[in-house]
Amino acid sequence: MATFNPDKVKTVPANREITVRDLLSHSSGLQEGVVGFMQMLKDKKPRSSLEEEAKKYAGIPLGFQPGEGTGYSPIAGFDMLGLLIERVSGEKVGDFMKEKIFNPLGMKDTFFYPDTEEQNKRIVRVYKRKKDKLVDVTGGKDDIDSLLKRSNGYTACSGGLFSTVGDFDKFAKMLLWGGEYNGARILKEETVLLMATEAPKNHLEPDPGCVWGLGMKIRQNPKKANSFATEGTYGWSGAFGTHFFISPKDNLAAVFMTNRTDLNGSGSYISKEIERLVFGCFGEENKNV
């Protein structure tokens, strides 16, 4: 890896253009695999705008042909979705989300980057387990927010959203209840159904027994996935261990939050334990146990 040069990789033309579905289902190939990872590590420049990021991504070889593979692309893929929102709406993506999602749902404590003294006072610390104790790593190299603040010139859709359990619970319930919460219609029912349905035309499993919906990972085969969730459960996790999931079969939505840098996002052992406990109590298959 030390001698690997991503600039000398042999490339071939893409078979087709990348679609919105590709971006949402992590099947675009953008900034994915060894080449994408090495290019990301090489990039030390402060981020200035989504437009500038798009130009940068355009010069990075895809990890695979669009729609023919799967690879987690939370930075490039979701930044491009943010740029698309700005182009279509004519608004900054942060303002658009506040107007169309946060305010209608009453998510008053959800925002991209704290910009007031009161907000900064309420931000929780970031921790990492070192040996047998948790160490405060806020603001250090292990704190991804410090890295994301390279992007102060614009709202990075790949990260930087702050929220609370109460606020995010409203968002989760909106999805569980078919796109509507507390009288506010955010999404059509068919849109929510699409989010929770396998999206790529090719059957692509990012993990055994799991497939991508639109922005969501779906437990298609819980036994194969070694999961306690019921079939069709969907959701996603944050880099610091936040986790939410929705089980349409059980009429269940759950939100869990923590703030540690060593939990491996969606692979967190804590997230799996939370799922085991929740489905053990409320899951359809366990109601008669």
Question: Where are the regions a protein language model picked out?
Answer:
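Short, small/polar residue-rich loop motifs at catalytic or cofactor-binding pockets
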Residues: 238-240
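Short, surface-exposed loop or secondary-structure junction motifs
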Residues: 1-231
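Short, gly/Ser/Thr-rich active-site loops of penicillin-recognizing serine hydrolases
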Residues: 177-181, 191, 196-202, 221, ...
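Short, ordered coil/turn segments that flank beta-strands lining enzyme active or ligand-binding pockets
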Residues: 130, 248-249
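A short, flexible beta-alpha/helix-coil linker loop
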Residues: 63, 260-263
